């Protein structure tokens, strides 16, 4: 990405948003971050991320919900971003089953507002955006039987509302790109983990329970597989993609979708055993956790597995962090995190 590029990162106090904004600031970009700072998980962790970002003189933050159309419009007019990276979303598959309203508000209405602001970004003499990058999710593949998951595969049968909203985002983004010429790229992330992560994610929640000596719940009796992808690999992928807006396809549309995943699924049981070993090495726990084995939960899928052929072809990049090394990095950070709490 060019030095001094003006980049808007939505969801900047979130897990991926924080790490991405940090990387862009290191590259010399001018970064505006927005976040609604909701309490879906520990706000203190979001505040800590934000505190680190605001130490950079080229970072500016506004507390804002992308569902607030007027506030977002004013921000675009004031900052005139060149690149927009939309990471703001209501996350979580299981939470969407009992709290659908927040997913429609953030993931549908909020993303529509982002698209509208991009559509009108060249008005009033502004340069306008040259690339919109947005977070989709591996959850759009639903219960697809074919693996690895390719961006060419049909994704018409979501098994959660969260997945349905992410697929809806892809459809809306394509329509806006086709109608208004907005260069747009969607990124399907696969089970992102790492330091300063989301407490609602399994690895973080398991670590919390292990520290408290509580029993951890293993769904589908441990017979599940996830394509665990380390945060630095995800950030590197987003950065690579953001630098290069898509070329026109045969229909004249500047729109692409890529998987960003480690393309090496690991079993849930191996993941838990690895987490235990890393936490013991970091001095966080002294013995393995007690485990309760349960059936598959609604909204869950048996396996995720990324085909990153298109990412490798177009950018010469694919994630490669081994789970063992990435999880140790998380455990070492978590040890400090626990001591501070």
Predicted features, each with a name:
Residues 1-192, 235, 317, 333, ...:
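N-terminal Rossmann-like NAD(P)+-binding domain of SDR-like oxidoreductases, especially those catalyzing
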Residues 168, 172, 176, 206, ...:
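Hydrophobic alpha-helix immediately C-terminal to the catalytic Tyr-X-X-X-Lys motif of short-chain
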Residues 196:
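Conserved GTPase G-domain signal focused on the G5
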Residues 208-341:
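C-terminal substrate-binding subdomain of Rossmann-fold SDR/epimerase-dehydratase oxidoreductases
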């Amino acid at each position: 990405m060019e030095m001094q590029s003006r980049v808007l990162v939505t969801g900047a106090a979130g897990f991926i948003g924080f790490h991405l904004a940090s990387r862009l600031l290191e590259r010399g970009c001018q970064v505006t971050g927005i976040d609604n700072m909701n309490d879906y998980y520990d706000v203190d962790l979001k505040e800590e991320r934000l505190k680190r970002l605001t130490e950079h003189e080229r970072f500016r933050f506004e507390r804002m919900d992308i569902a607030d159309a007027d506030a977002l419009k004013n921000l675009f007019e004031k900052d005139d971003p060149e690149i927009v990276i939309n990471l703001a979303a209501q996350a979580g598959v299981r939470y969407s089953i009992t709290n659908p309203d927040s997913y429609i508000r953030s993931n549908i209405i909020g993303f529509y507002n982002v698209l509208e602001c991009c559509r009108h970004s060249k008005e009033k003499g502004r340069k306008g955006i040259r690339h919109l990058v947005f977070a989709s999710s591996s959850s759009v593949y639903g219960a697809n039987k074919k693996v690895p998951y390719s961006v060419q595969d049909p994704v018409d049968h979501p098994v959660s509302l969260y997945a349905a909203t992410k697929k809806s985002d892809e459809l809306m983004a394509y329509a806006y790109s086709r109608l208004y010429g907005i260069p747009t790229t969607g990124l399907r992330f696969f089970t992102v983990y790492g330091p300063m992560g989301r407490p609602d994610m399994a690895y973080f929640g398991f670590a919390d329970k292990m520290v408290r000596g509580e029993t951890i719940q293993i769904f589908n009796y441990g017979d599940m597989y996830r394509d665990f992808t380390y945060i630095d690999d995800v950030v590197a992928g987003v950065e690579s993609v953001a630098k290069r807006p898509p070329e026109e396809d045969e229909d004249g549309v500047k729109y692409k979708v890529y998987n960003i995943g480690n393309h090496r699924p690991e079993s849930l049981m191996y993941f838990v055993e690895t987490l235990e070993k890393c936490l013991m090495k970091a001095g966080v726990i002294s013995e393995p956790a007690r485990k309760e084995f349960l059936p598959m939960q609604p909204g869950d899928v048996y396996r995720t597995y990324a085909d990153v052929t298109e990412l490798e072809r177009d950018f010469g990049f694919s994630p490669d962090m081994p789970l063992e090394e990435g999880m140790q990095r998380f455990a070492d950070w978590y040890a400090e995190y626990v001591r501070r709490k």
